Swiss-Prot record:
SUPFAM superfamilies documented for this protein: Translation proteins SH3-like domain (SSF50104)
Lineage: Archaea, Thermoproteota, Thermoprotei, Thermoproteales, Thermoproteaceae
GO cellular component, one term: large ribosomal subunit
Quaternary structure note: Part of the 50S ribosomal subunit.
Protein's UniProt keywords contain Phosphoprotein: no
Role noted for this protein: One of two assembly initiator proteins, it binds directly to the 5'-end of the 23S rRNA, where it nucleates assembly of the 50S subunit.
NCBIfam families recorded: rplX_A_E (TIGR01080)
Biased composition (Basic residues): 11-21
UniProt keyword RNA-binding present: yes
Keywords assigned by UniProt, alphabetized: Ribonucleoprotein, Ribosomal protein, RNA-binding, rRNA-binding
Protein name, per record: Large ribosomal subunit protein uL24
């Protein structure tokens, strides 16, 4: 979870979360990618969007796979089409799930800007990893 305040006091932590601006809340809506997607895309986590397919890891709907139908920035919750229950009237109610309790198994890649951002992040990670591998202890570097 991103750091919104340096205080360890619960009241200040709660206030920082409830008063957080939308661009900070977007970072709170980040979920990890599946191992296959991590290898394929070269990144570990990404903010959840409508249309992504997720696997629920915790709670009553554990093991359920479905598409994200809604992302609630105010409550920092996502709604998955397969995580719902029926009211006595027959109306379906979607259950709110925290994004940290899901793993993204399939990305919605219809947005070109999102794909470009993923590529940019992957290239930056590869460049950073390449810099680390330049001098190793076996090559005469200090350990």
């Amino acid at each position: 979870m991103p750091v919104l305040t340096s205080s360890s006091q619960p009241r200040k932590q709660h206030k920082a979360l409830t008063k957080a601006p939308w661009h900070a809340r977007r970072r709170l809506l980040t979920a990890p990618l599946s191992k296959d997607l991590q290898r394929q895309l070269g990144i570990r986590r990404i903010p959840v969007r409508v249309g992504d397919t997720v696997l629920i890891l915790r709670g009553d709907f554990k093991g359920t796979r479905g598409k994200v139908t809604r992302v609630d920035y105010k409550r920092v919750r996502i709604y998955v089409d397969s995580a719902s229950f029926k009211k006595p009237s027959g109306e379906a109610v979607y259950y709110p799930i925290h994004p940290s309790k899901v793993v993204i198994v399939e990305l919605d890649q219809s947005d070109k800007a999102r794909v470009a951002a993923i590529d940019k992040t992957r290239k930056a990670r590869e460049a950073k990893a390449g810099v680390r591998e330049v001098i190793t202890p076996q090559q005469g570097g200090q350990s």
